[in-house]
Amino acid sequence: MRYAIIADIHANLAALMAVLTDITKREEIGGVWCLGDIIGYGPDPRQCIELLRRTNHICVAGNHDLAAIGEIDTSDFNPDAAAACEWTAKQLTAQDRVYLKGLPLVIEKDDFTLAHGSPRQPIWEYILSISTARENFAYFKSKFCLVSHSHVPVIFKYGKTGSCSFSQFSTNKELVLGEERLIINPGAVGQPRDGDPRASYAIYDSETKKIKLYRVPYDIAATQARMVEQRLPLRLVGRLSHGI
C-alpha cells in the first residue's frame, strides 16, 4: 500500500489542492499521513481543515493547530505568527475546534512514529542538528520517525555504532528503508523554507519499503492575494515567493 505524507499545510488552500491533485495522478493511495500545522500563517484555515477531513487520513497536532484553539500559549511566537494565529482563531467554527482539539500529539503507524516537532517534544522542538536528532532517537521505539515543523526536507540516520548523519531529502529521490533507524522530514506543503517555493510532500510504499519526495508548483500569487485581502502580515505574504 502507498501512503502520502504531508505536513505544514498552513492554511494554504492552493498548495494543498495542488498536492492532493498530484497525489491522485499517481498509483492508488491508501491514505494520507499528516504531520500537523494544518492552519496558521495562511488565508484559508477552514477550507484546509475541511478538505483534509474529506480524505482518508491520520493527523497529529502541530503548534499552530493548538495555538489557534487556545491549547498552548503563543508567547514564543514571533509577532507575525502571533498576529496570524489571532486572525486564524477568529475564523474557526466550533466543529473545526473540536477536530483540532482531538488531534493526538504522536501516532504510531506500522514501522513509523509520527510527530510534528520531535518525538521528545512533539509540539515545540525543531530537529535541525545532528546532535538534536541523535538525542531524539531514544524517544521512539519504531524503526522510523516522521517529523515536520522546520519546513525543510531532511533525513537523519542513526548508525549501529551510535553515530548520526544528516542529508538533504532531494526531490524525486527514492529513500530505501533498511535496517538503519531514520528521522525523516518531508518538507512543507504550504510554506516551504528550503529555498524552493514549490509545495513538498512524500509517498511511502509499504511493499517496496521506499519513500520518494515530490515537489509541486501551485498558484502562489493566488494565495498571496488572499493573504493581502485578509490583511495578514506582509512578511508572511512575501516569503512564499522565495520558499523561505
Task: List each model region and its residues.
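Short beta-strand scaffold segments in enzyme catalytic cores
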Residues: 106-109, 153-157, 200-204
